[in-house]
Amino acid sequence: GCGDINAACKSDCDCCGNSVTCDCYFTDCKCRESAIRKQF
């Protein structure tokens, strides 16, 4: 999940859902499609 690496962003990433990955840029949480999702 998003909080595995970017723990500080976990609360922000919760809105991303299971189909995206979270990247943390300072205080902003960016969401992107996960590699697993793109396989389908």
Swiss-Prot record:
Domain of life from the UniProt record: Eukaryota
Cell compartments where the protein resides: Secreted
Tissue: Expressed by the venom gland.
Disulfide topology: C2-C16, C9-C22, C15-C31, C24-C29
Keywords (A to Z) from UniProt: Disulfide bond, Ion channel impairing toxin, Ionotropic glutamate receptor inhibitor, Knottin, Neurotoxin, Postsynaptic neurotoxin, Secreted, Toxin, Voltage-gated sodium channel impairing toxin
GO MF term list: sodium channel regulator activity; toxin activity
GO CC annotations, alphabetized: extracellular region; host cell postsynaptic membrane
Function: Insecticidal neurotoxin that reversibly inhibits the N-methyl-D-aspartate (NMDA)-subtype of ionotropic glutamate receptor (GRIN) and inhibits inactivation of insect sodium channels (Nav). In vivo, is highly toxic to insects.
Protein family according to the UniProt entry: Belongs to the neurotoxin 03 (Tx2) family. 05 subfamily.
Domain observations: The presence of a 'disulfide through disulfide knot' structurally defines this protein as a knottin.
Name this protein carries in UniProt: U12-ctenitoxin-Co1a
